């Protein structure tokens, strides 16, 4: 697909603007995805407000965003499992594909992984992205593209629940009702935990936790 696309670019701390760039051409093993939704993560805000997270320092111009969902609009010649029109969620970590961990399906442990919106790798606050087809996951009909964009943070919550061996009949407390706290609460409920309580100091967040299924909430600023 030829043409230009709009890209939201971080031009400095607290400074955003738009650029026009060429729509990327997918390689044989890639698909071109027209992005419909990209979540705004806490790390995006941190980079925007401070210009760095630890040793990862933004060198403008830089593109933020790593929680994308969209529609396949072009398919590389080697891609067989996706077609134009498929709605997909994108894995934001790009891996080598041939190390022992990648071959075992544990590609999150790849020593050469690079991540959308982690300097120096640009993110996806843009209209299109070419991405490895094996890292694009087709969404079922009962999952919207908006929900697909939230699979990345949801996976963090499920990983926490799995690591904690959450199971039927347990009680659990989640400290913090930000995005990750809320999806962790939902993951605990999905794994059968009987009672999940959420602690925060912001009433609006606690209200959202109750709306999403918490069994109870505690305002840490008001209660011991």
Q: Which residues make up each language-model segment?
A:
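Short, conserved catalytic or interaction motifs in soluble domains
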Residues: 12, 50, 77, 141, ...
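Cytochrome P450 core scaffold surrounding the K-helix E-X-X-R motif
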Residues: 43-49
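Glycine-rich beta-strand-centered segment in the early N-terminal region that forms part
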Residues: 24-38, 53-100, 140-142
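N-terminal Rossmann-fold NAD(P) dinucleotide-binding loop
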Residues: 181-182
